[in-house]
């Protein structure tokens, strides 16, 4: 049902239906924003890039082939947008901590743990990091990652396993479940 719904939304968006465009943005905005944030580390820049992703998506909607998933197409655009961002900037991403509006101690602790994990993920080699972000943070299935990155499923499994090993070493834990 999801696939047909997305297909219908894309068809309506191509026809100029603003409501369909809005539904597509609402459906995927959070995931694409998180993806950008995990690569850019700046919430304002990530928001700008997310908007750029959707602008690109809608301006090139006529090129979209409906045999793939909308989500994967958006992640592809997001990946290219992030790469272009760094090509223009030519800076190494800063290790600034994200500012949070959370005030309770629990939220601060959770944010601290998440930031520690994110910093460890940033240290992974690029190919492994990309796979890890899609798997652990975006919660894509291994098969979806393989399709998105145009690699074999066995390579995705290897990269996820390698990411777990490297993260355990970086975070100094003995079992991945401790993370």
Where are these regions (language model features)?
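C-terminal edge and immediately downstream basic/flexible tail or linker adjoining helix-turn-helix-like DNA-binding
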Residues: 1-4, 8, 12, 41, ...
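Internal acidic/polar
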Residues: 3-6, 84, 91-122, 141
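Sigma70-family region 2
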Residues: 14-15, 54-69, 88-89
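Short, charged helix-capping/linker segments at alpha-helix termini
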Residues: 14-22, 33-52, 153, 174-179
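Arg/Lys-rich amphipathic alpha helix in sigma70-family domain 2
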Residues: 62-66, 76-95
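DNA-recognition helix of helix-turn-helix
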Residues: 83, 128, 143, 149-174
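A short pre-motif secondary-structure segment
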Residues: 131-135
